[in-house]
Amino acid sequence: RGPNPNDTYYDMVDLAPYLSKGKNEVKFLLWYFGKSGFSHKSSGQSGMIFDSPSIGLVSDSSWLSQRLDAYRTAGKPVVNYRLSEANILYDARLEGQDGYKPSVELGEWGCKPWNNLILRPIPQWKDYGIKPLEYTVSNDGEGNTILTARLPYNAQMTPVIDLDAAEEGVLVKMETDHIMGGSEPCVRAEYITRKGSQKYESLGWMNGDELRVIYPENAGITFNSLGYRETGYNCEREGSFTSSDETINRFWEKAMRTLYVNMRDTYFDCPDRERAQWWGDVTILMGQSFYQLSPDVNALTKKAIQTHMY
């Protein structure tokens, strides 16, 4: 969660584009992992520090907060122990049933569990926007309908579903063809419907070449659309290569995609099973990035070197 096992990164965000003249209401959606992994050491407690003195907005007891019970942890199979996050389950039946309560001040800047706060050295993710997917419909022979959509390449993405449900309580599962990347369970998602029309984006990113949505046959579900939002490290492709051999050209493109899908808040060995900064993998990725990506990638390289000692 930070530059070392004890301290914490903070983000600097420009609120101006989100504010309008007059009264504004500011809301944050906080995801507390509640577990450690190869790339994250849990603080043991959820919390938020916010400080914008120029507009008199600070994170004190005047804030109201609520635990969103609609967000839960999905059942088995759970993610393997290497991953920092858990699989998200969202129960749409519980939307809007949570009440706000006064927040509790946990301590000042520099106190536990945050300790020293260090400005995050890399940019926020590059958001490519929501894009539609074409899909096929099949049955698995075990009572389930499966929507299968081919992604344009192996991407870091969040799935977006738009459907009508005749009844509430239908479990919809979302996963990719990399669900067992490296032979152990990786990130997937679950959604429980409410009755009527609904649209949902699962915010836990996953990766793969193919998105699959699974739900019971004859459950009264009608899908209106299926989509995805790709996000990734915020840089541009600048290096290029071409030849008269299409096989070599395709190989170069696949190598470029392999590089990009293995970088986010750090370089990592794989985007599915571990997402961890194994140095043997990092040195290969860093060397490639200098040739293929814009100088924005240098911030990620510097961060990798600085955190290597931990």
Regions found by a protein language model. Name each.
Residues 1-272, 281, 296-308:
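Extracellular/oxidizing-compartment recognition motifs
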Residues 284-295:
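Well-ordered alpha-helical scaffold segments within catalytic/enzyme domains
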